[in-house]
UniProtKB/Swiss-Prot annotation:
Belongs to the purine/pyrimidine phosphoribosyltransferase family. XGPT subfamily. It comes from Edwardsiella ictaluri (strain 93-146). Pathway: Purine metabolism; GMP biosynthesis via salvage pathway; GMP from guanine: step 1/1; Purine metabolism; XMP biosynthesis via salvage pathway; XMP from xanthine: step 1/1. Xanthine binds at D92, I135. Keywords: Cell inner membrane, Cell membrane, Glycosyltransferase, Magnesium, Membrane, Metal-binding, Purine salvage, Transferase. This is Xanthine-guanine phosphoribosyltransferase. It catalyses: GMP + diphosphate = guanine + 5-phospho-alpha-D-ribose 1-diphosphate; XMP + diphosphate = xanthine + 5-phospho-alpha-D-ribose 1-diphosphate; IMP + diphosphate = hypoxanthine + 5-phospho-alpha-D-ribose 1-diphosphate.
Length: 152
């Protein structure tokens, strides 16, 4: 990846609330399925904003920090997804998204960020990201002191 896009906690919450507004009225949803781990934080925000208490997970391993590797399904939520919002932080190449579509064909699949290759696989997203950009999520970063350039 040649570029980095840094996401702060407040920006993530703002984008997720924007997505939640598009998912109203909340009564049409049975629950949320969070794609672990990237979809866990957005799922918590969506659950709060929509008043949804039924939250499950599908656990798929496809990244090792910044290296994409083979998909492994570690845990599935039951059913075909009918009445459920499936949420992940990002759709990238579409590998994970296609697996989600195959497992939950009747779900409404949303992400916060979408890259061109995976965009056709999601029902809704908030932010367009160039394909060659790595997203640094707030849960992968910490705040630290930076020495002034002048050394004072």
């Amino acid at each position: 990846m040649s570029e980095k896009y840094v996401v702060t906690w407040d920006v993530l919450q703002m984008h997720t609330r924007k997505l939640a507004a598009r998912l109203l009225p909340a009564e049409r949803w049975t629950g949320i399925i969070a794609v672990s781990r990237g979809g866990l934080v957005p799922a918590a925000i969506l659950a709060r904003e929509l008043g949804i208490r039924h939250v499950d997970t599908v656990c798929i391993s496809s990244y090792d920090h910044d290296n994409q590797r083979e998909l492994r399904v570690l845990k599935c939520a039951e059913g075909d997804g009918e009445g459920f919002i499936v949420v992940d932080d990002l759709v990238d190449t579409g590998g994970t998204a296609q697996a989600i579509r195959d497992m939950y064909p009747k779900a409404h699949f949303v992400t916060i960020f979408a890259k061109p290759a995976g965009r056709p696989l999601v029902d809704d997203y908030v932010v367009d990201i160039p394909q060659n950009t790595w997203i640094e999520q707030p849960w992968d970063m910490g705040v630290s002191f930076v020495e002034p350039l002048s050394g004072r």
